[in-house]
C-alpha cells in the first residue's frame, strides 16, 4: 500500500497490531508516515506478541494500548481522547479449530468488537466523516472452500463454513450496512 507522503497529520488506530499481519502494517505506517501518530490497540491474546514490534516500540509516533475491542466504555473513551482520524481494523479471533470449540468467543470479538469500533467511530465524528476512513480486514474464508481450481472475486456469494468464517462474514455485513 503506497500512500502520498504529503498527507496531513493523522491519528491512526490499528487494531490487532501485535499479530502477525498487524505488526507488519504497524511497522509500515510507523516508518513511512512520521507525521502520523500510530496507536496500536491489541489485547495480547495467544495471537498477539509485542516482540513483533521491538524495532518500532520507541518510535516517537508509536503508542501501544492494551485493550479489548469489545469493551465499549474503553473504546469510546479512547476515541474521545485521541480523536482517531482513521481505523485499520485487523483484530480478530482467527483460528478455525478454536472457533469450533468456542464459537461464542469468535462472535464476541469478530462481530461485537467490530460493531463497538464502528459505533465509536460514528459517534466521534457524527456527521463529519470527510477525510476519515474505517478499513475493515476480512478473510477469503467468508466465501467458503475453493477447491483445486477457480478463484474468488468481490462478487462471489458468501458461503462461510466455520464459526470463524461466519463471524467474519457477519462483521463484513455490519461494516457495509
Question: Language-model features: where?
Answer:
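N-terminal Rossmann-like NAD(P)+-binding domain of SDR-like oxidoreductases, especially those catalyzing
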Residues: 1-177
Amino acid at each position: 500500500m503506497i500512500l502520498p507522503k504529503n498527507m496531513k497529520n493523522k491519528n491512526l488506530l490499528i487494531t490487532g497490531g501485535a499479530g502477525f499481519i498487524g505488526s507488519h502494517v504497524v511497522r509500515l505506517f510507523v516508518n513511512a508516515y512520521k507525521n502520523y501518530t500510530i496507536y496500536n490497540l491489541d489485547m495480547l491474546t495467544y495471537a498477539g506478541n509485542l516482540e513483533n514490534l521491538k524495532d518500532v516500540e520507541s518510535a516517537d509516533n508509536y503508542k501501544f494500548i492494551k485493550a479489548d475491542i469489545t469493551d465499549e466504555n474503553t473504546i469510546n473513551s479512547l476515541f474521545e481522547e485521541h480523536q482517531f482520524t482513521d481505523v485499520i481494523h485487523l483484530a480478530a479471533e482467527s483460528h478455525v479449530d478454536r472457533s469450533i470449540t468456542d464459537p461464542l468467543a469468535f462472535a464476541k470479538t469478530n462481530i461485537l468488537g467490530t460493531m463497538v469500533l464502528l459505533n465509536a467511530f460514528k459517534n466521534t465524528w457524527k456527521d463529519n466523516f470527510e477525510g476519515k476512513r474505517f478499513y475493515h480486514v476480512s478473510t477469503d474464508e467468508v466465501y467458503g472452500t475453493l477447491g483445486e481450481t477457480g478463484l474468488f472475486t468481490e462478487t462471489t456469494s458468501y458461503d462461510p463454513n466455520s464459526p470463524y468464517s461466519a463471524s467474519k462474514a457477519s462483521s463484513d455485513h455490519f461494516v457495509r450496512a
